[in-house]
């Protein structure tokens, strides 16, 4: 049941164009009573409207908690999304949350955008 619920949360939700901040979030499903195992999944969220990485996490964590899940921010960075050229580049870090594991974020993004060139680097801010 928990895993089915987590599957309903999209792995990736990012703006369609531009350079913007993003966060990598781990979502926890509440385990059935008596079951010590907790189902988790990582999700990527990035939006142009966010002035700070925390703005994204605060909005998304509120939505996640309303659905009965818990979550934590694993880090952040920036995304350059060029939809015309079908390119996405993940880089940088968050001052508040630290650097996200861009390799994990990139794999999630590649799954959603299979016909894009998706790259990442640890440099830049």
Swiss-Prot record:
Record GO terms (molecular function): actin filament binding; calcium channel inhibitor activity; protein histidine phosphatase activity; transmembrane transporter binding
Does the keyword field hold Flavoprotein?
Answer: no
Q: What is its main location?
A: cytoplasm
- Catalytic site positions: 53 (proton acceptor)
User: Which keywords appear in this protein's UniProt record, sorted alphabetically?
Assistant: Acetylation, Cytoplasm, Hydrolase, Protein phosphatase
Q: Which InterPro entries match?
A: Janus (IPR007702), Janus_sf (IPR038596)
- Known Pfam families for this protein? Ocnus (PF05005)
Which gene does this sequence derive from? PHPT1
Q: What class of enzyme is it?
A: hydrolase
What are the binding positions for substrate in this chain?
Answer: 21, 94-96
- Where does the record say this protein resides? Cytoplasm
Q: What is its EC number?
A: 3.9.1.3
- PANTHER family assigned: 14 KDA PHOSPHOHISTIDINE PHOSPHATASE (PTHR12258:SF10), JANUS-A/JANUS-B (PTHR12258)
Description of how the protein assembles with itself and partners: Monomer.
UniProt-recorded name of the protein: 14 kDa phosphohistidine phosphatase
Q: Name one GO cellular component term.
A: plasma membrane
Under catalytic activity, the entry for this protein gives:
N(pros)-phospho-L-histidyl-[protein] + H2O = L-histidyl-[protein] + phosphate; N(tele)-phospho-L-histidyl-[protein] + H2O = L-histidyl-[protein] + phosphate
Q: Name one GO biological process term.
A: lamellipodium organization
Question: N-acetylalanine modification sites?
Answer: 2
Please name the source species: Bos taurus
Q: What does this protein do?
A: Exhibits phosphohistidine phosphatase activity.
Family, as annotated: Belongs to the janus family.
């Amino acid at each position: 049941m928990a895993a089915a619920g987590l599957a309903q949360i999209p792995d990736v939700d990012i703006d369609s164009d531009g350079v913007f901040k993003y966060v990598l979030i781990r979502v926890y499903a509440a385990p059935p009573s008596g079951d010590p195992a907790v189902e988790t999944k990582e999700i990527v969220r990035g939006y142009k409207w966010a002035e700070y990485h925390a703005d994204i996490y605060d909005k998304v964590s509120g939505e996640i908690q309303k659905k009965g899940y818990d979550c934590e921010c694993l880090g952040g960075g920036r995304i350059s999304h060029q939809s015309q050229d079908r390119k996405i580049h993940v880089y940088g870090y968050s001052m508040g949350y630290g650097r996200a594991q861009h390799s994990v974020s990139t794999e999630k993004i590649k799954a959603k955008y299979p016909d894009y060139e998706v790259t990442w680097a640890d440099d830049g801010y």
